[in-house]
Amino acid sequence: MSKQTLVLLYGGRSAEREVSVLSAESVMRAVNYDKFLVKTYFITQMGQFIKTQQFSEKPSESERLMTNETIELTQKIKPSDIYEEGAVVFPVLHGPMGEDGSIQGFLEVLRMPYIGTNVMSSSIAMDKITTKRVLESIGIPQVAYTVYIDGQDLEACLVETLARLTFPIFVKPANMGSSVGISKAQTKVELRKAIQLALTYDSRVLIEQGVIAREIEVGLLGNDKVKSTLPGEVIKDVDFYDYQAKYVDNKITMAIPADVDQSIVTEMRSYAEVAFKALGGCGLSRCDFFLTQDGQVYLNELNTMPGFTQWSMYPLLWENMGLAYPDLIEELVTLAQEIFDQRESHLI
């Protein structure tokens, strides 16, 4: 039986490129090589496409994907050279130029099936501000927030924010994931600095009310018929769950499934599925919730390309549901082909 080609795109232009490499390496080890041939392409910080490795069998634990330190410029290709008839693309890319609809639009122009949400849902979900406004419109609870856009009156924003929110306050770039650029502010001075830091990553800044809450996550899988997982909990040994804690210091553990009341489980899974459909989701996503001590549930964000490292919540959530990592990848490929066929049928 001939193998199907699975194209892995990794790296990318965003500050989350290191997470992308870790995720892609986990995917390349989890693939069922009885069914798939894996071809990998590294996208540099400057947006160049580099042809890297090809795997017909499971690589050793010591083998690493090529990155800036190991690639050769002679391997540079035109982006369109990744095209291969019958191949499915897994864009294991996080953040801007990865989850924001850019690479999805490129792959649609190439007429290649790809894993993950489409152009519209990717771009909406990537923007935390737009996502909040969509979710508010369908009645899904959100923590209180204000917005700052680069060029506006910063002092006026600070006055509005302090009139509506109380410390601690969290400040986030609107279009960034993996907790990149997020700060916790306890004073007006810290709030101003946090906004200025967020502006180095994006021109749109989300300013959120801090809440004392557990962080609970639900995995989603499907196209028209979406399935959700039992929730898992991020248990932190740090003040807040930032990039350093997630990927460098590894100061987190996970409880899967989370120890929460059944009524809360039902509420979270329902909110997750409704949010996924409202944003036009397909393929996969992960919904991140806050659960306060008094039982209030807030949907924090919907992540359209969650981390796929060996310690990432999304694949572990599905393993808890009985879907092993290799089978999860196979299901994602099937969903990608299904949505591609559906999209193509509408263009003929």
Curated annotation (Swiss-Prot):
One Pfam family from the record? Dala_Dala_lig_N
What are its E.C. numbers? Answer: 6.3.2.4
> Which top EC class is named for this enzyme in its record?
ligase
Q: How is the cofactor bound?
A: Binds 2 magnesium or manganese ions per subunit.
Specify the ATP-grasp domain's residue ranges.
Answer: 132-334
Localization per record: Cytoplasm
Per the record's keyword annotation, is Nucleotide-binding included, yes or no?
Answer: yes
Q: Where are the transmembrane segments?
A: none
Q: Could you tell me the Gene Ontology terms of the biological process aspect for this record?
A: cell wall organization; peptidoglycan biosynthetic process; regulation of cell shape
InterPro entries linked to this entry:
ATP-grasp (IPR011761), ATP_grasp_subdomain_1 (IPR013815), D-Ala_lig_Van_CS (IPR000291), D_ala_D_ala (IPR005905), Dala_Dala_lig_C (IPR011095), Dala_Dala_lig_N (IPR011127), PreATP-grasp_dom_sf (IPR016185)
Q: Which superkingdom does the taxonomy of this entry point to?
A: Bacteria
Q: Where does ATP bind?
A: 162-217
Where is the signal peptide, in residue numbers?
none
Q: Which reaction does it catalyse?
A: 2 D-alanine + ATP = D-alanyl-D-alanine + ADP + phosphate + H(+)
Q: What does the UniProt function comment say about this protein?
A: Cell wall formation.
By sequence similarity, the record places it as follows: Belongs to the D-alanine--D-alanine ligase family.
Q: What is this protein called?
A: D-alanine--D-alanine ligase
Native species: Streptococcus pyogenes serotype M4 (strain MGAS10750)
